[in-house]
Amino acid sequence: MIMHFTMNTLRTHMLRPWTILTLTVCLLTGPLFAAPMTEEDREHLLVHFEMTTLMVAEQVRGLSPAQLEYKVSPDRWSIREVVSHLAVAEPDYWRDLQKALKPTPDMKEKKSSATDADILWYGIDRVVHTKTGGGHEKVDTYKNLGEALGKFEALRATMIEYIKTTNDDMRAHSFGDREVIDCWQWMLEISTHAERHIQQIREIKNDPNFPRK
């Protein structure tokens, strides 16, 4: 489940520290409102979505069935289950975004509960763990990695095309009820949510008992 984080609580396929630092600095200097989306905001979203889309595919490429089904402990997800979760969750997140963009723009009367940098940090920080809910914990929806990855990549293609072409004023529309952010930030959070699970896949692969083949 995606959580909105405060500070308290690239066009590339490699997650390098300088990439995150550069993107964070750029986001901090971005505008609060844009009508429609600025090219700077568009590029930041595009870079992050392309990065995480490629990284998911890279992390699972060439893994054996034993590796895909390996669990660090019985109560933790396997790599196949992580990808299945993304394939189940992202369609809901995408629909939520489209719904939030329909009402009259309202961010001039509201204040975001998080900065862009907070949302970027959410993708990196694996110290704070959140419990998945809303049906997104149904990680056995896709028993086959290829099917789950195909669903994930197909929707990612749709979202990336939207980022490239939309004229929606995403900064002007709020998202959420209790902890409000703007719709541009929610779109970014869809990608940083995937980034968290990429980190999770890496943790599984780095476990001492992870199958060698």
Per-segment meaning from a language model:
Residues R42-Y70, E195:
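N-terminal targeting signals for Sec/Tat export/insertion, comprising classic cleavable signal peptides
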Residues R126, T130-I190:
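A charged, solvent-exposed segment within the mature domains of Sec-exported extracytoplasmic proteins
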Residues E39-L46, Q67-S73, S78-S84, K138-L149, ...:
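Second-shell loop/turn segments in exported
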Residues F5-L21:
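Bacterial N-terminal signal peptides that target proteins for export
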Residues E69-I119, E161, T165-K213:
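Short, contiguous alpha-helical
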Residues H48-M51, M55, D92, K151-A154, ...:
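Charged, amphipathic alpha-helical oligomerization/scaffolding segments
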Residues G30-H44, R95-F152, D207-K213:
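Short, helix-capping/interhelical loops that line the mouth of catalytic, cofactor-
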Residues W18-P31:
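Bacterial N-terminal signal peptides
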